[in-house]
């Protein structure tokens, strides 16, 4: 099972749904974990009986909302071994969740931001406050791109 972290204050929900859709089309079983403060996936992805923490399916993608770590997800699905997913996409915007989901041990981590001051400053603050060092690839978003 591959674990991929998406870190930063920028909203990553739509991007993760698009990545997950590509991965499921390639026959991968994918779980998106929304561990962000706002939990936007709760409002974007339909759920029949939403509770404080739950897993719902949307277009062959499973989405976990409200969990503090992978162990809570294992408990929810009733397993003590590894989860049955090929890929975990973990969306995080706090130091606590980065540590709880052990993203320092992830196969890959991406720092996702745009050029707005909030996303940049909050993202830098987040990275500065981490206890464990992370190897990151940055992704920048902009509404308008220059043709160069």
Which role does the model predict for each range below?
Residues 20, 24, 103:
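Gly/Ala-rich phosphate-binding loop of Rossmann-like dinucleotide-binding domains
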Residues 87, 92-148:
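Conserved catalytic-core segment of NTP-binding enzymes
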Residues 2-17, 21, 31-86, 93-96:
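P-loop/Walker-type NTP enzyme "switch/lid" segment
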Residues 24, 43, 50-53, 129, ...:
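Solvent-exposed, non-transmembrane amphipathic alpha-helical segments
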Residues 24, 78-82, 127, 131:
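Surface-exposed amphipathic alpha-helices with a cationic face
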């Amino acid at each position: 099972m591959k674990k991929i972290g998406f870190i930063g204050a920028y909203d990553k929900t739509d991007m993760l749904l698009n990545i997950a859709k590509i991965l499921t089309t390639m026959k991968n079983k994918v779980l998106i974990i929304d561990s962000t403060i706002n939990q936007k996936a709760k409002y974007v992805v339909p759920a029949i009986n939403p509770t404080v923490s739950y897993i719902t399916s949307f277009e062959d993608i499973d989405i976990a909302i409200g969990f503090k770590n992978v162990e809570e997800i294992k408990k929810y699905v009733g397993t003590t071994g590894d989860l049955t997913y090929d890929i975990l996409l973990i969306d995080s915007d706090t130091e606590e969740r980065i540590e709880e989901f052990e993203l320092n041990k992830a196969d890959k981590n991406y720092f996702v931001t745009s050029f707005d001051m909030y996303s940049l400053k909050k993202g830098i603050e987040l990275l500065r406050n981490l206890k464990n060092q992370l190897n990151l690839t940055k992704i920048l978003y902009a509404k308008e791109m220059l043709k160069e």
